[in-house]
From Swiss-Prot:
This is Cytoplasmic FMR1-interacting protein 2. The keyword Cytoplasm applies. Involved in T-cell adhesion and p53-dependent induction of apoptosis. Does not bind RNA. As component of the WAVE1 complex, required for BDNF-NTRK2 endocytic trafficking and signaling from early endosomes. Its main location: cytoplasm. The keyword Metal-binding does not apply. Disulfide bonds: none annotated. GO terms for cellular component: cytoplasm; neuron projection; nucleus; perinuclear region of cytoplasm; synapse. It holds the Pfam family CYRIA-B_Rac1-bd. Component of the WAVE1 complex composed of ABI2, CYFIP2, BRK1, NCKAP1 and WASF1/WAVE1. Interacts with RAC1 (activated form) which causes the complex to dissociate, releasing activated WASF1. The complex can also be activated by NCK1. Interacts with SHANK3; the interaction mediates the association of SHANK3 with the WAVE1 complex. Interacts with FMR1; the interaction occurs in a RNA-dependent manner. Interacts with FXR1 and FXR2. Interacts with TMEM108 (via N-terminus); the interaction associates TMEM108 with the WAVE1 complex.
Amino acid sequence: MTTHVTLEDALSNVDLLEELPLPDQQPCIEPPPSSIMYQANFDTNFEDRNAFVTGIARYIEQATVHSSMNEMLEEGHEYAVMLYTWRSCSRAIPQVKCNEQPNRVEIYEKTVEVLEPEVTKLMKFMYFQRKAIERFCSEVKRLCHAERRKDFVSEAYLLTLGKFINMFAVLDELKNMKCSVKNDHSAYKRAAQFLRKMADPQSIQESQNLSMFLANHNRITQCLHQQLEVIPGYEELLADIVNICVDYYENKMYLTPSEKHMLLKVMGFGLYLMDGNVSNIYKLDAKKRINLSKIDKFFKQLQVVPLFGDMQIELARYIETSAHYEENKSKWTCTQSSISPQYNICEQMVQIRDDHIRFISELARYSNSEVVTGSGLDSQKSDEEYRELFDLALRGLQLLSKWSAHVMEVYSWKLVHPTDKFCNKDCPGTAEEYERATRYNYTSEEKFAFVEVIAMIKGLQVLMGRMESVFNQAIRNTIYAALQDFAQVTLREPLRQAVRKKKNVLISVLQAIRKTICDWEGGREPPNDPCLRGEKDPKGGFDIKVPRRAVGPSSTQLYMVRTMLESLIADKSGSKKTLRSSLDGPIVLAIEDFHKQSFFFTHLLNISEALQQCCDLSQLWFREFFLELTMGRRIQFPIEMSMPWILTDHILETKEPSMMEYVLYPLDLYNDSAYYALTKFKKQFLYDEIEAEVNLCFDQFVYKLADQIFAYYKAMAGSVLLDKRFRAECKNYGVIIPYPPSNRYETLLKQRHVQLLGRSIDLNRLITQRISAAMYKSLDQAISRFESEDLTSIVELEWLLEINRLTHRLLCKHMTLDSFDAMFREANHNVSAPYGRITLHVFWELNFDFLPNYCYNGSTNRFVRTAIPFTQEPQRDKPANIQPYYLYGSKPLNIAYSHIYSSYRNFVGPPHFKTICRLLGYQGIAVVMEELLKIVESLLQGTILQYVKTLIEVMPKICRLPRHEYGSPGILEFFHHQLKDIIEYAELKTDVFQSLREVGNAILFCLLIEQALSQEEVCDLLHAAPFQNILPRVYIKEGERLEVRMKRLEAKYAPLHLVPLIERLGTPQQIAIAREGDLLTKERLCCGLSMFEVILTRIRSYLQDPIWRGPPPTNGVMHVDECVEFHRLWSAMQFVYCIPVGTNEFTAEQCFGDGLNWAGCSIIVLLGQQRRFDLFDFCYHLLKVQRQDGKDEIIKNVPLKKMADRIRKYQILNNEVFAILNKYMKSVETDSSTVEHVRCFQPPIHQSLATTC
C-alpha cells in the first residue's frame, strides 16, 4: 500500500539530502580537525563523595582533601599561565623623562590605571603561594605526625602531593624568569608613590612584600624548604613521594608526556627539598630508603625535560644545587656533560618506524572489520574481543605518548643547547639565541625525522579517532566486566576466609569495595551466598551471573575502589599487623595485578581527551621564555625561527619526494598551539599571533608549493619533448640530462578541504590560481623572449609554446585550468585585438631587420645576415632574468634546448617559415602581407622611383648591341664606356641596390610563406581525411572487386565520419559549423587558391608611372636601341654588379643576396619586358660573344673571363626567377583573357621600291 506524501514533506526530504556527507575520496594526509561536539568529562573532582556511604570513611575524608588540593593545583596552573604569558606593559607606556615634564601626572595616572589590575593579580599570586605552601606543609605535618607515620597513605594522595611539589618548582622558575613582571611592578609602584595612592602603612607594607617576593630568586623554594625542615620526619614522606614517582616511571605507569615529565621533575625537586640541614639524601640512600643510583640512571637517560611552555629544566641542576652535592659528586653520572642517545632522533627512527608499521597493521585489521564493514557498534562481541580492542586502544595511546614525548624531549634538549658558528658553519655570528636554538640547530636528517614522527603521530591520531566510538564501546564493556568480575567473583574467596577467620577490618574493607562497585544481576547482593557466612560453595557450585553492560564507573567510584584495594596490599597499616598478611599469596597477586591494570581506566574512559593530550605538540610554537630574553627587542620572532614553518619549509626547499605527502602535518602544529592558547592558556593575543603567522606561512606555503608543482611539470614536459637522439649523443659524451625525479604532488593536489585554524581551505583551488598565473607568465615570458630577439628565434618560440602546451595538459589532469588557447591568446594580447604580439613582432622584425639586413641564397633556400649592414641593428628590449622553470623547466634543459636551437640562429629558412605559418595563422599572415605590400609600394613609388628617374637620365639615349666582329674585349670596352655614368653613380651600389634588395626580400618572403603554408595545409588535409570519409584507394588482388573493398573500408571508418554524426546528434548551430568546416578543409587546396598571384598583381598596380615603360616607341612597335625602358636600366645595373670585385671587396651577392635579382626580375616580368630583356641585355650579349671567341683579357681593370662567368651565374638565376614568376603570372593571364591578342604589321618595303612607288 502506497503512502501519500505531501509536497511540503517531499521538499523537506529533499532539503535533508544537503546534510548527507558526500565523501570525495580525498587522500588523508592531514591530522583530524577539532571536533565541534562537546567532550564529555565525567570527572566530578570527588563532588559525589558523600554518596558512597558504604565506603571507608577515612578514604571519603581523603577524597575531600584531594578535591580541595586539586582545586588549588588548578589555581596554581592559572598563575603559571599568567606568569608565562606575561608581556611587559611598562615598555609600551610612555616614560616620564624628567620631573618638569608637564604631562607627567597624566602619564602616571594612565600607568596606574593600566597596571593596577595586573599588580592585583601579582598580589593574589603572592598570597596564593603562601597559602599553597602552608597547605602543603600542613598536610606533610599531619601525615608525618608520630601517631600517623605508619598509617596507610594512598598512591593517589602521594601523587597529588607530588603535583604540588611540581607546581612549586614551575611557579618559582617562572617567577625567576620573568623580568617584565618586576619591571611592570616597579613602574606601577613608582607611579603610585608619585600619586600617593599607597598612603596607609598596610598598602606600603604589602607593596614592599611584593617587591621583595618578586626580586628574590627561588623565594618559593626557600620558603617551602624552610617550613618543611621544621616538620619532624618530613623527609620520610618526601621519600615516599619520590619512591612512588620512581616506581611509576620505571613501570611506565603514566600515559601523557606531561605525566612522564612531571614524575621526573618531582624526583629531582623532591631530592632537592629532602637534602638540607636536617636530612641527607645520601644517608637515606645508604639506608635503602631511596635509590639514588636508579634516579641517576633516569636523569642520565633524560637530561632535559619541559618545565612550562618553551622553558626547560636540566634535571641534574636539582642535584647540583642540593646541600650535600659537592662531597658526593662522584656518585652522580647525570651531572657529567654527555649527550644521551635518547636525543639522537635519527637513530631512534628505526625502532619508531618498526613500532608504527606493526601497530598500524594491527589497527587496520580491526578498522576494516569495525569501521569499513560497519559491524562495529551494531554487533555484540565477546569479552575477549572487547579486551583485545581495549588493549589495542591502550597500546595506541602509549605509542602516541611515547613518540610525542620523544619529539618534545629532543626539542627541549635543543633549546637548552643552542648551536653556534663553530658547530654549524651556516649559523652567522650575529644570530639570536632563539634562532641558534631552532633555525640552525637541526640537521636536514633531524628535520626529516621530526616531520616523519609528527606525521606518524597525527596519522595514527586520525585512524584512532575514526575508531573512537568502537573503542569507547569496548573500553566501557571491558572496564565494567573487569570491575564486576573482580568484585563479585575474585573477592568472594578472600571474603569467605575473612568471615571464617573473623577478620573484621578485612571484612569491612572487602564489603565496602563490593558495595561501592558491584552491579548485581537482580539489583541486590544474593543473600544466600555461602561466602557471606564463611561457608564453602555447594558441590554443584554457587552460580553468580555477572551482567554485561557498556557502563564505566564514575571517577570517585574508581578512586574509592582502587584506594581500598591498595589499602589491602599496602605495607603500611594503622595497626601493628598489615591487612596484606591476612590475605593469601594468589589473592595478593590478583589484587596487585588488578590495581596496576585499573590505573589506566581513568584515561581510557576519557579516550577522546587522552588521545588529544597524547598527540599534543603545541609547545613547539610557544616562545615566551625566549621573547623575554630579548628584553623587548623583539615583539615576536619571524617565521624563519618558528619550528612549524622550519619543518614545512625544509620539505619544500629540499623537494624530497618521500616527505612531500607529509607537508601538511607540520602546519597542524599551529592548530595544536592555537587550541592550547584558547583552551589552556586562554589568551586571545597568543591566538592572534598564531593566526597572523599562519596567514603568512600559508601564503608562503601555497606560493612555494605552486611554484614547485609548476616547475616539476614544466621540467617533465621539457624532458618528454627533448630530442631522444640529442639526449643519447649527450650521454655518449658523458653529459647526463636527468629526468625530473618522480614526486608526490598528485596527493596534495587532491586536497579540497584542508583544516587550518578552523578554516576549510581548498588547497587545489589556491594552487590552481597560482599555477594559472604562472602558466600565463610562462607564455608571456616566451613571447617576451621572442620580442627581445630577431626573427630566427621564432622556432624556439614554437617549442617553448609546445612545452607549455604539454605542461598545461599534464596539469589539467589534477586541476581545472582555462583552456591553453585562451591562455595563449591572453598572453599574446590577441583576445580582442585582430593580431597579437607575435604577429606584430614578426612584422617589426621583417620591416626593421629582415628586409634590409638579410641576403637570400637560392641554392640553400635560406636568408642569412648581410656581411655589410646598410642600416643600424634595431634596438630590442633585453629579456628579463627569470627562473629556469619559466623557459624549458630546469637549467640543464635550458642549456640543452639552447644548444639545439642555436643551429637555427644564423639563418631564416623553411623551418622558420613553417613556424611563422603555424603561429600566425591565416589572419596573421594576411596582416603581415598587407603591411609588406605597403612597404613595397612606398619603395616602388618613392625611393626606387626617384632613383629610376635619375638613372634613366644618366643612361645613354641610344645603346646598340655591337656586332660580333668587334670581339668580346671590344664589346666589353664599348659597354664600359657607354655605361660609365651608371658605373660611377655613387649611390647605385648602396641605396639603390639596398632598396631593391628590400623589395626582393619582401617578394621572396611572400613566396616562401605560401610554399610553407601549402605544406601545412596538405598536412591538415591528410590528418582530416579519415574524419571526412576521404579514404585512399586500396590494393586489390587479382579477381577482387575494388568497389567491394572500398565499401568495406568505408563501413570501417564510418564511425569517424564527423559530419553525419553531428547531423544526427548535434544542434542546428553545430551542424552548420561542421558543414562549413568540412567544406573549407576540402576546398581550400582543391580550388587552387594562390596568395602569391595576388601579391604580384598588387605589386604590378604600383608600377603605373610612365618612367617604367618609357614613351611610346617611334616605330610604333617597340624600343630597340633606345634606353628608355626599365629593362634597359636593369641591364645596366646587372652589368655593374657582374663586374668582378677586388680581393678584399664584397660581391653584390654577399651584400645583397638574390633578393636584388628577384626585385629586378619581378619588376621586368610585371612590366611585361622579359623577352626584350633577354634579347637586348648587355651582359647576355657580351656572354654570347665571349663564348664564341673564348678570349680572356683585362679591359679597364675588368677580367673578361671572370665577368663572363659571373654573367652566366646571374643568367641562370634570372631564368629561374622568370620561370617561377611566369608560373604564377601565366595563370593570371589565362584567367583574365583566353584570346591571344595578335597585331598585324605590313610587310617591310625596300627603300628603292618605296621611292619608285
